[in-house]
């Protein structure tokens, strides 16, 4: 088990656009396993590679509830190829923005093309929480955070709070 440190707002790494994965090998599968370990440890239901400092287009999701068998999904180079006009709203949070939640409206259903960890092309049609989670994590791969979907006033308040916390953490390290 290898838990990676999470990148936390306001770290500019979170705004990077991730590069496509070109090699599907044991190293990629090991990294996916580490991502699951990190996500489960946090705990969370989704994690993009950029959130652990790797700017590659890969994400992991597991929506299994506590007490249910794990249901891990690996998405490499995912692309939303279709989304519904119908919208749904979910309260979202993010491992990179701890303890902050906000309602975000997104397309209710999406179709995503992606590769599995072995490089085999896959496609998934998703609705509900899976659709929301896929859009949230794919946003990360494009340098977009869920707070970018809320009002500027709320977003600015969140960023200010996390900049202050980062400054406090940095000053403690200096001591």
UniProtKB/Swiss-Prot annotation:
InterPro entries: Peptide_deformylase (IPR023635), Peptide_deformylase_sf (IPR036821)
Cofactor note: Binds 1 Fe(2+) ion.
Cofactors named for this entry: Fe(2+)
Residues annotated to bind Fe cation: 94, 136, 140
Gene3D superfamilies with a match to the protein in the record: Peptide deformylase (3.90.45.10)
CDD domains for this protein: Pep_deformylase (cd00487)
Keyword annotations of the record: Hydrolase, Iron, Metal-binding, Protein biosynthesis
SUPFAM superfamilies: Peptide deformylase (SSF56420)
Active site: 137
Domain of life the protein comes from: Bacteria
E.C. numbers: 3.5.1.88
GO molecular function: metal ion binding; peptide deformylase activity
Enzymatic reactions: N-terminal N-formyl-L-methionyl-[peptide] + H2O = N-terminal L-methionyl-[peptide] + formate
GO process terms (BP): co-translational protein modification; translation
Stated role: Removes the formyl group from the N-terminal Met of newly synthesized proteins. Requires at least a dipeptide for an efficient rate of reaction. N-terminal L-methionine is a prerequisite for activity but the enzyme has broad specificity at other positions.
Family: Belongs to the polypeptide deformylase family.
Protein name: Peptide deformylase
Organism of this sequence: Brucella melitensis biotype 1 (strain ATCC 23456 / CCUG 17765 / NCTC 10094 / 16M)
Lineage: Bacteria, Pseudomonadati, Pseudomonadota, Alphaproteobacteria, Hyphomicrobiales
């Amino acid at each position: 088990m290898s838990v990676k440190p999470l990148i936390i707002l306001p770290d500019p790494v979170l705004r990077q656009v991730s590069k496509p994965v070109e090699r599907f090998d044991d190293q990629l599968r090991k990294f996916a396993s580490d991502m699951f370990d990190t996500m489960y440890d946090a705990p969370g239901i989704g994690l993009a590679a950029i959130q652990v400092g790797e700017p590659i287009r890969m994400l992991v999701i597991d929506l299994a509830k506590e007490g249910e068998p794990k249901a891990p999904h690996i998405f490499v180079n995912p692309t939303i190829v279709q989304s519904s006009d119908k919208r749904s709203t979910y309260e979202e949070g993010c491992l990179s923005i701890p303890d902050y939640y906000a309602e975000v409206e997104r397309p209710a259903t999406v179709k995503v093309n992606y590769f599995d960890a072995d490089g085999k092309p896959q496609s998934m049609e998703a609705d509900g929480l899976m659709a929301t989670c896929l859009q949230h994590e794919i946003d990360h791969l494009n340098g977009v955070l869920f707070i970018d979907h809320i009002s500027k006033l709320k977003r600015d308040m969140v960023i200010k709070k996390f900049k202050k916390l980062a400054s406090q953490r940095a000053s403690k390290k200096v001591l």
